[in-house]
Amino acid sequence: MEKTYVPLKRMGWNEADVEILTPAKADRGASKAEENKNGAPKNKKGTIPIFFATDNNYLPFLSITLESLWENSSHEYDYEMYVLHSGIREDYQEKIMRYNKEGFSISFVDVTERLKPILEHLHMRDYYTCTTYFRVFIAGMFPQFDKALYMDCDTVVLGDIADLYHYDLGTNLIGGAPCEGVNSFQVYKDYVTKVDGLNPDYFFNAGVILMNLKAFREEKFYEQFADLLKRYKFTVIQDEDYLNVLCQDRVLRLPRAWNKSPVGPDKLAREDLRIVHFIMTWKPWRYSDIPYQEYFWEYAERTEFYDEISARRDNSTEEDIEKDKAGEASLKALAQSEIDRADGYFKVYGKC
């Protein structure tokens, strides 16, 4: 396993060096290598940076995202993938690095040192971990990029990701699709309205976002986030609360096809889907009746994590299901309690 060290100053940091894992490129199969060799243009149109954040529990699902992204995206571009983490198993990293190839590079970036100054202020609940906050570090860590995509690891890419990247953000900070998890339940709609002070129809899901990194730096977004994090703790939708509050009025609303969840008023046909996002407890590795699960398993079968992922599904118990139900009920109760607070965010601070 070959490792390189990149000075943090080159990435906008002032700490010691950060380790970025970049093994030699691996061949994922003769047919795919031949396709890339013969089908991909030699002169690429540009580079598309894509960021992920994960821990050991979710890393196997990243393989599905990468597999589907590679299969469905234009090879007219180079893709640079960065996996932000705070301690991923070496064997897991090695498996993911087998997707590393010409025009499709992957680097693991440990953000542990970056996390320390704000760690005590982060609030995590049930299945959330601190990885959900990693996306706020991207603009400061990677000054070489003015624009980038961020994606959660529980996604399946069915459209050309280059099309998403080329949306014109203008002066907007973020491009995101409406959050179907919020708009499918009245208590969450009320929460966004009364606690965040936002229109739930325009509340975006942060699991697939197009980021204007140049504007983030110019507006000192990280400093604004760190300040708000110390002043108020959003406990329900957490990092998405912060992002939506801080980016309000500067969000490009993307078609929901780019972040379609299993919940929502209707189902999109395969030809209309671009990215499927298995939000909240709607996980195909836990349940066998999740909408769009066929796309998840289609790509899961092609990965080296398939046995592990299918074992999670097969070993899911009634106790796990009851735990999910209890978690859903608890979250709704928490949302209602936040709505009822006399010192809720919007009641105290008003419009950001």
Which sequence ranges carry the predicted segments?
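A glycosyltransferase accessory/donor-loop signature
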Residues: 1-35, 39-48, 54, 61-64, ...
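Hydrophobic targeting segments
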Residues: 49-52, 69, 80-82
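Histidine-anchored nucleotide/phosphate-binding helix
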Residues: 59-74
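Active-site-proximal specificity loops/subdomain of glycosyltransferases
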Residues: 100-138
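Conserved donor-nucleotide/metal-binding helix-loop-beta segment in metal-dependent transferases, i.e.
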Residues: 158-187
